[in-house]
């Protein structure tokens, strides 16, 4: 599935050599924790003034929306965070709703592209191991973006419901065909593909969405390396075993 491009989205981005589109630049390694405000929305290449303005607005909007939600966020606050006049924000994004949708779709696009190009003749176990590792890295590197998406969905997805029931549903159906072929070949447990994705998403995203809970229980101060080092191996093994994944021999 290819998510729609919007103003402010980049062209070519990478997560460990996996192509990612729509404005995020990151290296999704477990030992790298860039500031959300400094990376989301960036293309990583030289751009014109207009493109740089859009990138700055998107970065600022991600932070403000993640803290205040859609209803609580004000365009004036986004403009202040971006360090530009309110009029500039509305020049590039005509309404707050337009900007919010662009930010949310960026997050979703980044997550979906993290799966890479899985194929029926690929290695099921290795493909999902890599996917889970990338999703955990995204949760660590971009917790605000993850929480923003969670807030939108928990509230009933009023802004992006059509996107979820359209492009996201088609994406799950497309990738689900690969899962079904693996199941037919005895390389994956017979679990509904949609529910398999739900399990992967909820387990990996909880490390961002429930950061306060994880810190309280573990005693961690911030998202230090130890938390993700410990979690990654356990989460990957639990999902690989739970999904009954095997190497294609």
Please report, for each region that a protein language model flagged, where it lies by residue.
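Short hydrophobic clusters on alpha-helical segments that form packing/core surfaces
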Residues: 53, 57-65, 135, 239
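Hydrophobic alpha-helical connector segments
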Residues: 116-145, 193-200, 229
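C-terminal peripheral helix-coil segments that are non-catalytic and often amphipathic
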Residues: 1-41, 134-137, 141, 169, ...
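Amphipathic alpha-helical linker/stalk segments
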Residues: 101-130, 175-181
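Hydrophobic/aromatic residues within well-ordered alpha-helical segments
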Residues: 53, 96, 103, 107, ...
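Helix-turn-helix
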Residues: 56, 64-98, 102
